[in-house]
Each structure stands twice: as structure tokens, then as C-alpha cells.
Amino acid sequence: MLFFGTTINYLDRIVLGILLPDIRSELHISDQEYSFITAAFQTAYTVGFLFMGSVVDRIGSRLAYGIAALCWSASAGLTVLAHNALQLGIWRAALGLSESCNFPAAIKSVADWFDHKDRASATGVFNSGTNVAAMVGPPIFVYLSQQYGWRACFMVTAGLGILWVIAWLQIHPKKVKAEHKEPQGLSWLEAARLREAWGFALGKFFSDPAWWFYLFWMPLYLHDVRKLDMVTVGWSLLFIYVMAGVGGMVGGWASGRLIRNGWQPLRARKATMLVCACAMPFAALGVLVPSATAAIVLFSLATGFHQAWSANLFTTVSDTVPSKAVGAVTGLGGFAGGVSGIIFSAIIPGYVIPAFGYTPVFLAMGGFYFAGLFAMHELMKRTAAPR
């Protein structure tokens, strides 16, 4: 259920970027207006993290996740009413606010349901929903848009979200054992006093911009710079995010294997993340190669290594903080990642790309991971959370 919830969450998120060439021509949206629309989503998504994590800790993942999914589905459906950039930005902001509950609720569920050695794998599986959405979304959305218009795509994702909420409330137990043991969660201000929370937050701050940039700008890059038609863009994104899904699951398996071989959990996560950090600058060189095919292959490696990084990064929270703080710490990290996403993947590209092209942005994104890993290494030292 976490996998399907995350998949639908990301289908709602990526549909705008995929259909932007069509939406842009109908609503007359410029690159700068698009950058502000993405910033509206990111701002709401970021602000939501400040309280969504605490809400999850206090009322439980079942109820919090269900309400949030219902709200983001409504926001997606109401997007069909947009007739200009401002209206589109408003509905995207509403979507972002409600979608900010997804990862705190999912990580909290993993912490409650799985042992240390299995958490990265479980996180990799549900987080692969982001990649499945990015795989199946482009060809499906392009087809639906060509047959029925772009507004039909938003109605489809809204309907899927409502169906998921019904299933989630039926399947999820009303209360799990960990919620009986620790009914009182922490606020994000209380979570901010934890040293490990800042390690996780800085890890998110330095790695999230790359994912957001690929998510929001990759379709436009392939269409505008590599001169691929919309159908080819859709299939190219399918391959890129297939590799992202594989990377997430392999990354979770790798650290789990190290733990089974006797490594401490946090050391295993950091070792796996170091490999990912070393690979990202190389993968970003896809922007420099003359061949569109080679570029797509390199970008697929970038998304794969990012998701391997992400599967382990998320799991460090349940490895290092008490169960009652997992949602709040995840929310604090999401806030940090959202702030950096607004700055480095929404606003700055809107000015840098028209003036200098995509190259400096791609290259910068590849180098951020080392700073995030260094901060995590210094601030996250405990290898097991007290239970």
C-alpha cells in the first residue's frame, strides 16, 4: 500500500512537467512563469513538512495518510479548472501542501513495521513508486492528452487517489504496536533539538535539488534541447525511471546485505551512500555528450544512484531517532530538502537556463551529494534508535 500510495502521489506531481508543452501553448506560460508555478508547489510542499511529520506521529500514519491522500486527489482534480498560470499555481500549491504527508507517513510505517536490516529494502520498495510513476506516467499521460486533452490526465490521477484512500483505510490496522508504546509524538521544534535530525536535514538539503530538477525540467530538456518529440520523450523518461527504480531497490538491498554481514546499520547506510555520491558527478556529464542516447543512459544512472542514496538516507532516521520522533524528523528533513529544491531546482533554473543553458545546472547538481554525506557523517553517530 505504501508503494501504491507513493506511486499515485508522484503521478500527480509529474503530470504537469510531462504535459507542459501542451499546457504551455494553451495557457501561454513562459519559462519564468513555469519556474514560479514549480516554486509554488515546492513552497507549499516544504511548509507542509513542518507540521505533517508531527501530525503523523500524533494521530498515526493510517489516519494522517488517508486524509492527506484525499486532499491531494481533490487538488489534482480541481486543476482542470485552471485557465492561466496563476490559477495553475494555486492548485499546484494545494497539491504540494497535502502531498507533504506522504514520506513522513511512509517512513513512520516502515519504522513501526520492519526491523533494522529490512528497513532500507522496504524503503527502497515503496520509494520505487516514485520511479514507477515516472516510468508509466509519461507514455500514459501523453496518450491520454493526445486522445482526450491534458485535463483528462488530472481527472485520472484524482480518481486513482480516491480509490487508494478507500483501500488504505480498509487494509491498514487501526493501531500498530509502536503506536501503543509511544502515543505522544514530537513537534518539529522538539525534533530540531536532536543532532541526528540536522544530519538528516542536511543530507536532504544537498541531495533533493537534483531529484526535483530531473523531475521538473528533464521533459523540457529532452524536448527543447535534444529535439525529441513528445512520444520519444515519454519513452525516454520510461527508461530513465526504470533505472531509478532498480537503483532504489539495489541500494536498499546493498546496505541490508552489509548489515547481515555484521556491519552496524548506520555504517552500512553511509558506505552505500558514498558510492552513490561518487557516481553522481559522472552521471551528470550526460548534458555534455553529443548523442541523445548516451545522454539518456547517463541520466538514467543519475536517477538510479539518487534513488539508491535516498533509500538509505530515509532509513537513517529510523536507525538513529526514537520511534515517536520519526515522523517529525522526516518532516524536518523534508522541509530542508524543499527549501533547497525551491532555490536550486525551481527558481534558479528559471533564470540560469534562459541565459546560460542547462549545462551549469546539471553539473552543479552532480556535486552536491558530497556535502550532504559529510554533514551526515559528522552529525549522525548513533547506530540504533532507543525503543
Regions found by a protein language model. Give the residues of each.
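Helix-breaking motifs and short loop linkers at transmembrane-helix boundaries and internal kinks
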Residues: 28, 60, 81-87, 115, ...
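Extracytoplasmic gate region of multi-pass secondary transporters
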Residues: 16-17, 195-249, 306, 310, ...
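Juxtamembrane intracellular "pre-TM" segments in multi-pass secondary transporters
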Residues: 174-201, 225
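Cytoplasmic helix-loop-helix junction between adjacent transmembrane helices
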Residues: 91-130
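Residue-level signature of mid-helix packing/kink "hotspots" within the transmembrane helices
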Residues: 14, 42-50, 134-135, 241-245, ...
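Paired small-residue
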Residues: 71, 75-78, 86-94, 294-301
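Conserved MFS/SLC helix-loop-helix module at the cytosolic interface between two early adjacent transmembrane helices
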Residues: 47-86
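Helix-loop-helix hairpin linking two adjacent transmembrane segments in secondary transporters
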Residues: 126-170
